[in-house]
UniProtKB/Swiss-Prot annotation:
Manner of cofactor binding, per the entry note: Binds 2 divalent metal cations per subunit. Magnesium or manganese.
Region described as GTP cyclohydrolase II: spans on this chain: 205-417
Organism: Rhodococcus jostii (strain RHA1)
Family: In the N-terminal section; belongs to the DHBP synthase family. In the C-terminal section; belongs to the GTP cyclohydrolase II family.
Protein name: Riboflavin biosynthesis protein RibBA
Protein role: Catalyzes the conversion of D-ribulose 5-phosphate to formate and 3,4-dihydroxy-2-butanone 4-phosphate.
Length: 417
């Protein structure tokens, strides 16, 4: 097993102007980035980064700074499979040459981190790629973009970093993997940390959800306890329907049956046949009730896979004209799936869950969860009901979004799968 260094060492190194190596989830990019604070950028640091990485140097910033500096998205529809939020590229307007040298790029990076700079201080396009970090950092999105901003903040520096992927020295056509990254870090006296450890550190030292209320909820599936939560970042309210006894945040909640269900007004409340959300919610409540112990976490703000109710209705309009559920979102300039599960993970941890059997047909829900102190011991398939209205939708989820719906074509609309 690869040895990782402490988060405390990495933060101290960032504060001192050194670079660190940060690796992400093996089910995500499974790559390591060199990261340092943008305000500490020097020609030597940039040259070192260029030598050992792909050379596509990016500067993660928080959203407020992106807005202040006039940095719109590089492309209106973000099609990056990991949702990396690239903005327009820039160079410093004054004091540099062509913009590509290590000295020039270091100057641009420092200017991006300077709170007194403005949009007028940059030319576009340029040789440095700013990125917009998700508010909430790695607790909302377990990416290198957010890790860089978090590390800078934790080091009491401006929330701006510099990142680039480290290239393998064994096979220069590919990126370095964890074992090689450990050797690289040791050779150059750099700290090696994982985003999972950074998430765990922040989760231990910070809190981003608050428990508001708890009440008994009798349902047709049985009796549950509804535990209400509020996200501190955006004030969105979520509900965990708990069956049986859970141990609380300091207990041993292992192998708990869990469904993380995304809000769907049309399917859950109106009984729309265009999706399978309503039947999945009913099935999850029934399965947890029969288990006698478990959680159905109802995530608000996930309507239409995170695009919102009105955008979802607009997407339906495009689907009526022939687009599928993925293309409809993209045609609206929206991601195919804009959901994040960081807040949901914090709620599950607050309920005392340490490991779970996850009720889902979507393998992507597993990505990044380990970093929240949660282990998925089993993925439990959900029963679905296909019908004439949602059969195409289900096939699109299987074929284009990776949902595990093997054998869907063998069933006629209306039969239980």
């Amino acid at each position: 097993m690869t040895r990782f260094d402490s988060i405390e060492r990495a933060v101290a190194d960032i504060a001192a102007g050194k670079a660190v190596v940060v690796v992400d989830d093996e089910d995500r990019e499974n790559e390591g980035d060199l990261i340092f604070a943008a305000e500490k950028a020097t020609p030597e640091l940039v040259a070192f980064m260029v030598r050992y990485t792909s050379g596509y140097l990016c500067v993660p910033l928080d959203g407020a700074d992106c807005d202040r500096l006039g940095l719109p998205p590089m492309y209106a529809t973000n099609q990056d499979k990991h949702g990396t939020a690239y903005t327009v590229t820039v160079d410093a307007r004054e004091g540099i040459g062509t913009g590509i040298s290590a000295s020039d790029r270091a100057a641009t990076m420092r200017l991006l981190a300077d709170p007194s700079s403005g949009a007028q201080d940059f030319t576009r396009p340029g040789h440095v790629v700013p990125l917009r970090a998700k508010e909430g950092g790695v607790l909302r999105r377990p990416g290198h973009t957010e890790a860089a901003v978090d590390l800078a903040r934790m080091a009491d520096l401006r929330p701006a970093g510099v990142i680039c992927e480290i290239v393998s020295q064994k096979d220069e056509g590919h990126m370095a993997q964890t074992d090689e990254l450990r050797v690289f870090a040791d050779d150059h006296n750099l700290a090696l940390i994982s985003i999972a450890d950074l998430i765990a550190w922040r989760r231990k030292h910070e809190k981003h959800v608050e428990r508001v209320a708890s009440a008994r909820i009798p349902t047709r599936h049985g009796e549950f306890t509804a535990v209400g939560y509020r996200s501190i970042y955006d004030d969105v309210e979520h509900v965990a329907l708990v069956r049986g006894d859970l141990p609380g945040p300091d207990g041993d909640g292992s192998d708990v049956l869990v469904r993380v269900h995304s809000e769907c007004l049309t399917g859950d409340v109106f009984g729309s046949l265009r999706c399978d959300c309503g039947p999945q919610l009913d099935a999850a409540l029934d399965m947890v009730a029969q288990e006698g112990r478990g959680v159905v976490l109802y995530m608000r703000g996930h309507e239409g896979r995170g695009i919102g109710l009105m955008h979802k209705l607009q997407a339906y309009q495009l689907q009526d004209a022939g687009s599928d559920t993925v293309d409809a979102n993209l045609e609206l300039g929206l991601p195919a799936d804009a959901r994040d599960y960081g807040i949901g993970a914090q709620i599950l941890v607050d309920l005392g869950i340490s490991s779970m059997r996850l009720l889902t047909n979507n393998p992507a829900k597993r990505v990044g969860l380990d970093g929240y102190g949660l282990q998925i011991t089993e993925r439990v398939s959900m029963p679905l009901r296909a019908n004439a209205e949602n059969l195409t939708y289900l096939r699109t989820k299987r074929d284009r979004m990776g949902h595990d719906l093997i054998g869907l074509d063998d069933f006629e609309a209306g039969e239980m799968l």
